[in-house]
Amino acid sequence: MTRIGFMSDLHLDSNQFGDFEQQTLRQLLKEEGIDHLHIAGDLSNDLAKISLPFLETLKQEIPLSFNLGNHDMLGLSEQEISNYDFQVQQFGQTKLVSFSGWYDYSFVPEKSKEEHLRTKTNFWFDRRLERQLDDPSITAQTLQELEKLLMTLDGPIIVALHFVPHQDFLYDHPYFQRFNAFLGSQAFHRLFVKYRVKEVIFGHLHHRHQSRVIEGVRYHMRPLGYIREWELTRNFFNDFPQYKIPQMYRLHKRYNAVKDLVEFRDYKKKHLADELRDALTVIEVQ
């Protein structure tokens, strides 16, 4: 029996992952008996200087692999991005397929391509990336490559990708719904069903969901996300209500108000392992 651990959206730079955080993660993986760790994208905004050194250190403790998220692509060429796509690893009879994925605006079909591009240019991180094709073309190309690969595989298949493969996981708040266009594509799910993919792990959208089965595919989405979004940050304000601010719904403002407090730093140290554990998916394979 092999225990494969999956995480995503560590955002090492934004979350200021230092020695304590790394040691806490290593200890957690030991406690959980993880034999292999796969990280499904968004390690940091600097693959060469932050993510790869982090992975090299962690690799001394545990075998691991990863696929890129959109933040990892910053500063990379199209060839460098493609070099990390469509890795296949075998664990007994089970294959783990990992790739980034992308989006084609199909989650928000009521808006035009021009409207989506304006929103992306004004608000979305990916405006900083230098992709060679437009978004629908990147997604179509990715789907074509994915299908070619899945056609060649037999036995149980686990897929890890970064982007969202099913509409059930989209934003439902009216303000954020326009950003669903940049989350993924339902076409990935259709391929997973067609080729009987057993389990799918993804991130990108910083919400944690209980695993659920949709048309025979079990989906897991438990990204770590930014510290301002963490459960321990939310719980801190419940345990220390004197630090609440008038605009508690503004996550960055409430986090900035307490991040340097001794009470918050101590609280984070006490509860970090539980936060990381909540962002860990474990799949056992024969």
Give, region by region, the residue ranges found by the protein language model.
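A short C-terminal boundary segment appended to hydrolase-like catalytic domains
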Residues: 243-286
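Beta-strand-turn-beta hairpins that frame and shape the catalytic cleft
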Residues: 1-5, 88-98, 103, 108, ...
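Active-site-proximal loop/helix segment associated with metal-binding centers of metalloenzymes
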Residues: 98-154, 163-175, 247, 253, ...
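Active-site environment of divalent metal-dependent phosphoester hydrolases
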Residues: 11-16, 44-50, 71-77, 89, ...
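Short amphipathic alpha-helices and their capping/turn segments at secondary-structure boundaries
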Residues: 26-29, 79-93, 97, 142-155
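Conserved beta-sheet core of the metallophosphoesterase superfamily
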Residues: 56-58, 65, 92-95, 166-251
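N-terminal active-site segment of His-dependent metallophosphoesterases
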Residues: 1-59, 73-75, 124-130, 286
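Active-site neighborhood of phospho(di)ester-bond hydrolases with catalytic His/Asp-centered motifs
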Residues: 6-8, 37-42, 64-70, 83-84, ...
